Amino acid sequence: MAGSAGRRTLSGGIFLLSSLILAATGAAGNEITLREIVVTATRGPQAIARSGSAVTVITGEEIARAGARTLNEALRRVPGLDLTESGGTGATASVRLRGGEPGQTLVLIDGVRVNDPSTGNGQFDFSLLVPTGIERIEVLRGPQSALYGSDAMGGVVNIITRKGRGEPRAAIAAEGGSYGSRGVQAAVSGGDPRFNYAISLNGYDTAGFSRWGYRIGRLRARHPWPLENDGARRFGLSARFGFSPSEDVAFDVGGSAYVNATQYDAAFGAFPDTPSSSVQRLGQVHARATVHAFDRRLKNTFLVYANRTERDYRSISYYGSTAAPVTDWSKDGYVGGRVGASYQGDLSLDAFGLLTFGGQVERETLTSTSQPVLPVPGLRTTLDDAAQTTRSLFALHQIALAEHLNLSLGGRIDDIEGADRFATWRATLAYDIAESGTVLRASAGTGAKAPTLYQRLDPLYGNAALSPERSFGIDAGIDQKLFDGRLTLSGTLFLNRLRDLINFQSDPSCRPDQPFGCYVNVARADTSGFELAAKAELIPGRLGLDIAYTNLVAIDRTTDLRLARRPENTARIGLTLTPAPGLVIAPTLVLVDARYSAAHEKDRLAPYARLDLFASYEVSEGVSLFLRGENLTDARYEEVKNYGTAGRSLYAGLKASW
């Protein structure tokens, strides 16, 4: 059955891709160019038309026009990206790219890796971030380990913060609405050719709703008692400063701090609705120096960085009889640290292209502690105290052949202290027909994810002999602009083979003191499908259309069953209407297919349709009122089994800039 689904996916994708190519053939004569610049696809500025990679760019202006309240809402518009939240605002938010695991998505802030070394799978929790002070988000899909190393098996999400430009500017926004929610944002920025600055901060507070069981009829029927609300408080601060003493030298210093204090529930059990709470903190700093040499033929980039993630849990659970339950209460803490330095050189070879090369040294640390409080108090004990250093070398050669063809070939070697050394490669092709606004592209490469510190070195469950997870991925696509740029179409076919995936289970390779099991390289998986996107200016200045669609078949090859939390079909349809000067109305319809919450095709989650709407009106220059409606269809759905989602919600606020 899995094989037939994959064949249907491939056939349908080829048909749709062929249709786009035929449309491109008929578009000759439209003098259009695709000259948007991206930096993630090649570790440096490159016109998107010359990139063979599948990359989506979300600008800060697009985020503002859509009225995205969280970074999660902004990311949901990306084809090939799936995001799940465990019960509303403040809950753990996990991103999967093309069916990969959350820990197989590399997350960068201004080019610096921020995945959490203290988690079991190394994933980044997107609930920490809000879309304030963001200049753009670049989402690069497919294996990218040849450029970025471990964690980039599924792709890369690069969050680029705003850089100050021009006259000093300031902005402020405030809002309030359903579930006792209120938030405020503020930003200042400015700059000249020598110095620039940008600072932003935000705060958000919500009373929320019970993460377990909220608006889930089958659970409320079995557990009719009142549910306690699980609120959340978030704070974020980011700052970036730049100084250029000359045309050939530039310095960039930045940092950010985020705090997410939230309450949470268990997903299962006799008493899942508990007063448990957590506080998560992320702090990161970086300093970058760029020096041009040899008549600007060589650009040298030096980077040092550090980040630290702290997670503190007040875990409360109940067991025993309903008449006299026993309280189990513990305080658990996790700290993940990272410090590193890198060098990158970009050497112009004139007609022979551009050579990018460099190296990196990075040290990661993990500390975890636990202290029992009830029913028997105890002392705080250290469970994990581990560290590892990774040394890497990478190179990428890009060359333009003739007028239209652009090729790249790159590779990387990562050497992890006490673990396996691994090599990865990647090749891309882009055929840019500027006369017709057409780009044909393809890429192939390998990915790898090193075992996390917890998987390798945890005293109870770790396995120091683990090997990296591996993948091979290919994709092919077309980007086409029509009607003088008013319509942009994009289609991509993709296929990934994953092996040596790490699972926890009983295995002969486990140590004698691991009777319950350990982590082992045992699993295999395949993901395939196609991504479609369309942007259209239906009525210039009045009506715009934005569509993203993903078809995904993700199969666990050890069981030939579908992987959990991967819907086969996902679509997002957005309109932007400007019926009068200063008035913008943007409805969005999200359609998500059925999927399974747990492995082995267990806990089926029903499909759903959700309608959101954002409207803003500029009452005077620089001052706007806005209204946002979420889930106006009042759809009852779950992204994770037994965790509720918000019902029909309304929010209103004010924005001002000067």
Task: State each model region's role.
Residues 71-74, 93-96, 105-108, 124-130, ...:
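N-terminal periplasmic accessory domains that precede
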Residues 72, 76-116, 135:
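Extracytoplasmic beta-strand/coil segments of soluble accessory domains associated
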Residues 113-141, 460:
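Short acidic/polar hinge/loop motifs at secondary-structure boundaries
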Residues 158, 165-167, 173-175, 187-278:
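Periplasmic-side early beta-strands and strand-to-turn transitions of outer-membrane beta-barrels
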Residues 189, 200, 244, 536, ...:
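Conserved C-terminal beta-signal and adjacent last beta-strands/turns
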Residues 206, 210, 228-234, 248-300, ...:
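Flexible loop and strand-edge segments within Gram-negative outer membrane beta-barrel domains
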Residues 270-293, 334-337, 386-388, 432, ...:
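Outer-membrane beta-barrel signature, preferentially recognizing the C-terminal barrel domain
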Residues 400-407, 494-497, 518-599, 633:
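Gram-negative outer-membrane beta-barrel transporters
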